[in-house]
Amino acid sequence: MRQSWRPELLIVGAVVVIEGLQAAQRACGQRGPGPPEPQEGNTLPGEWPWQASVRRQGVHICSGSLVADTWVLTAAHCFEKMATAELSSWSVVLGSLKQEGQSPGAEEVGVAALQLPKAYNHYSQGSDLALLQLTHPTVQTTLCLPQPTYHFPFGASCWATGWDQNTSDVSRTLRNLRLRLISRPTCNCLYNRLHQRLLSNPARPGMLCGGAQPGEQGPCQGDSGGPVMCREPDGHWVQVGIISFTSKCAQEDTPVLLTDMAVHSSWLQAHVHEAAFLVQAPGVVKMSDENSCVACGSLRSAGPQAGALSQWPWDARLKHHGKLACGGALVSEVVVLTAAHCFIGRQTLEEWSVGLGAGPEEWGLKQLILHGAYTHPEGGYDVAFLLLAQPVTLGPGLRPLCLPYADHHLPDGEHGWVLGLTQKAGINYPQTVPVTVLGPMACSRQHAAPGGTGIPILPGMVCTTVVGEPPHCEGLSGAPLVHEIRGTWFLVGLHSFGDTCQSSAKPAVFAALSAYEDWISNLDWQVYFAEEPEPEAETGSCLVNSSQPASC
């Protein structure tokens, strides 16, 4: 695997080595013989003295790293469904450059005990780390670990090792792999651009990622459990992550998922007292990859304020013959969603233009698709799909909203935001209006004429009522109904009928976007669907040895 990135020196600040007991008294993270900087290609003998091959009955299963003279750190998923009595069949080979067999000078040590976090259930859920206690100490150099407050150099180049996948030789050799360290939000953003639900938001709390070099292959099968390492200015190498999983072999746009060492540092310190943990000196400049991938549903500001003029980066303003006719929402670089009723009797594309975000630029339309079942707003299916004539460039001022999947949860009483129109100096401006979701039966009753029955609120509809004092505004057809879940904003509705600005009048009724997942997906234009973000999880631990069951 040829590597093409230029090496970048990683400078993140001064480091103090907090020494533990015996193992940490010698220098951790000191790379072996070789050039001052690692080189892409085959690993040199002794270059990474802490590199471990974790084997079962002599066969390589996973990689690992020596973090104390009797402890090896690896991935928990390497030991799934393992019976306690099988510990004797496992061993660790240190100093070998061959995946099978041993290089000259390599050392093989047995495994006495295995520790797993309590929180570990499956590698995709996080907490994918394990500690192997060796049967006797080794003299190999150990790898440094980070303190919980360690700031990772996101966007910078770090290193991993992987077993060469481009050879048919059974005994694969160890190679150096340069990886770009990627934060969890950016990693999820990259995976969500693949538009595959099974791959959406894979980076859970307690994870980070590593991206391969452009056009090159990163860690692969057999590399699980191996360390991802960053170099400090004083020469210490610190393990920032454990290779956990990836989609096929890691590529630039499908990063490898890593177990975050800083998040799990307290757990490690509680179990490996001899390891050396690094703490960074005050004043370290944080490195960020925040702008390297524009995620759907992300806001750089604090969020909307009631009555404020809209500055949302996904707002769409649909103009017919130059006059504002409807609202809408940007859901990808080329797609805007709005209400179908906006185009009844006026479907000539050249008559329309679309403004986006807060900027003055306008886009033409290349294609217009109305839902085939639409007849009138009260009958449902009031959704239109607009394909822009030219793609937009996403950035701080232009970001798409996330679309909900069919099982997206939007309970009655949920808070959200809609847009109305307010006039200032004779000019219409979109105004943010806080709302709550109203149940279908209550919504139907409020739409009833005096003494009559209400209109049916169909399953593909959602109603809202204004929170607090009704604002001075008018409704805008096709305007988005949005709500936020743990920092991610979703497009949950498009205004169809009713009044978005008046709580005492008929409630606003929206086309519920979760009901249109299949219709939107079948149009075969990529848009940004997203899973609901999960809450943060805590980590714990348990010991697996001769006295406790492997399922602990």
From Swiss-Prot:
Q: Which Pfam families match?
A: Trypsin
* InterPro entries reported in the protein's UniProt record: Peptidase_S1_PA, Peptidase_S1_PA_chymotrypsin, Peptidase_S1A, Trypsin_dom, TRYPSIN_HIS, TRYPSIN_SER
Keyword annotations: Disulfide bond, Hydrolase, Protease, Repeat, Secreted, Serine protease, Signal
Give me the disulphide-bonded residues: C62-C78, C158-C230, C187-C209, C220-C249, C326-C342, C443-C463, C473-C501
GO BP: any one term:
proteolysis
Q: What is its EC number?
A: 3.4.21.-
- Gene Ontology MF terms: serine-type endopeptidase activity
Positions of the region Disordered? Answer: 27-46
Main localization, broad class: secreted
Q: Where in the cell is it found?
A: Secreted
Could you state one GO cellular component term attached to this entry? extracellular region
Residue stretches making up the Peptidase S1 domain: 24-273, 294-525
**What's this protein's function?**
In vitro can degrade the fibrinogen alpha chain of as well as pro-urokinase-type plasminogen activator.
Q: Which family does it belong to?
A: Belongs to the peptidase S1 family.
**Record protein name field:** Serine protease 53
Q: Which organism is it from?
A: Mus musculus (Mouse)
Organism lineage reads as: Eukaryota, Metazoa, Chordata, Craniata, Vertebrata
| Gene name of the record | Prss53
